[in-house]
Amino acid sequence: MTVAAPERAGGPWLYAGGPYPTAPAPVRPAAVLFDRDGTLVADVPYNGDPARVAPMPGARAALDALRGRGIPVGVVSNQSGVARGLLTRGQVEAVQRRVEELLGPFAVWAVCPHGPADGCGCRKPAPGLVLAACRRLGVAPEDTAVVGDIGADLGAARAAGARGVLVPTPVTRPEEIAAAPCRAADLPDAVRQLLGRPSSAEPVR
């Protein structure tokens, strides 16, 4: 995982992985971007401790199913703990490294370090993280899927023109679940749907 040059001052932090596979043009989605906390790993508020990183059930299998089909995977994550003075960039990056140790490499990380009052264009549900990740991967937002556990994740997908898939957890609000255009029981189910298989069909391998 290497730090990529910022697109502009005050924008998101970008981290480029790779080399990463590129899906053939007819394959949809061309890339899948995941929220981090509550989606790929258990949500530990403002976590700066790699030892507290715990993958969500089925996360590795779901990611490997996409990687095995040549579909790049990335992460789009709000980390307002930086703006609040609760996290350093070094802590954020240490947690990212631990996530990759447990779940494998990601083609791109797009991280918003700003707070809710900062007025940035990257904090979800704004589209900036999704758009920046798509540019880094060289894919069109409309050919990209975003998987997350709350309405802000799907809001960012919608604002960017991407497809959103909600994987609810106990903290997901009922109104967010009701409003989601696409829902999945868990990460393997989300991947099955994105690959065009029946929901809860054969196991993701």
What are these regions (language model features)?
Residues 59, 63-96, 105-118, 157:
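Substrate-recognition element of Asp-dependent hydrolases with the DxDx(T/V) motif
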Residues 44, 49, 81-86, 115-120, ...:
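A short acidic, helix-capping loop that chelates divalent metal ions and anchors anionic groups
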Residues 34, 73, 81, 144, ...:
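Short glycine- and Lys/Arg-enriched binding-loop motifs that mark or flank ligand-binding interfaces
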Residues 1-25, 30, 90-108, 117-146, ...:
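Asp-based, Mg2+/Mn2+-dependent phosphohydrolase catalytic module
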Residues 40-43, 76-78, 108-110, 131-134:
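A short alpha-helix capping/helix-coil boundary motif
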Residues 3-74:
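Active-site neighborhood of HAD-like aspartate-dependent phosphohydrolases
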